[in-house]
Amino acid sequence: KGLGGPRARGINKLTKTKSEFTDILFRNLAAAGFDLFAFYTPLGIGWLHEEYHRAVMTRRKINSFNDMNTFPFGQSLVYVRKVTDENLIMLSDNYNNDFRRLMIAGNEGQFHQIQTMQKNNFYLNQDLPNIPLYWMSTMTNIIYLNQSGDDIFNERIDEANAKEGTDISSRDFTGADFTTWVDALFFPDKPYTDRGLHPSGVGINRYIKPSQLSGEARSYLKKQGNLHWLNILSPHLVGFPKIKLKSTENGNYYGSFAVRHLLTPFGNDINLDIFYQTPKHNFFFAFHNYNNLNSSFFGLEGALIDKKLLDDKLLLSTRAMIWTQPKNQSFFTNIASIGAMFSICSSYAIGHWHPYIAIEGKTNGWVMGNVFLEKNISF
């Protein structure tokens, strides 16, 4: 999941002091500096964001290139490029659910990383300085989403089109993520070629300006920007990854939570993550509220994490979900479709090595971090 683990463990070793407060301060300052530097490098936050975009395209055998691999320090625009117009036409016209997800997959990837790091800090007692990354990743998404409907993006898109000229391979696959996402939500059947000719006269005009959005689409985008502030509601973000709930003769019981607002191919998922640890078990629960334009749907999730077996050498994790989501991932329907997901992962300790096997199966539906919207079994 990016550089979260290695970066934090190294910082922990380098910043040890006699004062606990000073130790925490130095560790988080060092982590913040590293995260800022790594933003424009492979395996950093920006790279991860673009790779989740690319994963959706790769799912449909579309080639692309992540410009974060070129170390673009200081650039305001970093692209996923070398994507042909023909491939975007194919994706939009034949796999419209994937096309809508493509636009917001980078946003999904960053919150998926945050959730994974929060789980590791909570259940594995890692005590890693992740707070700077949590805030940096969360706030970049909040600011990006809230600015997407502003008129300033009209100027930026005009400048980008002029700079890229007739070279199709130099163009980003979509431009502003969220304007293209919301336009595709409100007009799912609009042919991709209806975007018209690129201002240079070569290729399709890929980028959607805020000024091109309908009034309803622009209002919806603003609403999602306001809801995105829900992502800061977690004690993880203020330095309390574990809260002691009670102590017994058997040991301590801990809990924590996180609220998430995630964008989806049909609208959004507003969910509450519950972290719970007993002396012998690690539990994770989530309550999902899926929303399209006018209807709400619901889901439940539960997981047992790293259950120790065979003298603690075998670790077993299971996860299950059940949900109702909009039928066919539609933004407009009020008809629900029932779905489910189940996964199991087992690892065995051989010295310092922990080889593992994992299987995940799901029905049709959207699950954060799973690239497949249709039914699938992954190994």
Task: Identify the function of each model-found stretch.
Residues 79-183:
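Metalloprotease/metallohydrolase-associated module, dominated by Zn2+-dependent proteases
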Residues 250-263, 280-293, 314-326, 352-362:
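Transmembrane beta-strand segments that form the barrel wall of outer-membrane beta-barrel proteins
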Residues 20-59, 99-125, 131-147, 226-242:
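Hydrophobic alpha-helical membrane-anchor/signal-helix detector
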Residues 34-94:
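Small-residue-rich helix-interface/hinge motifs
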Residues 143-277:
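C-terminal membrane-associated helical module and adjoining short loops/tails
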Residues 272-274, 303, 344, 365-379:
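Outer-membrane beta-barrel "beta-signal"
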Residues 234-239, 264-270, 294-300, 332-342, ...:
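Residues that define the transmembrane beta-barrel architecture of outer-membrane proteins
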Residues 1-44, 62-73:
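Auxiliary, metal-adjacent structural segments of Zn-dependent hydrolase domains
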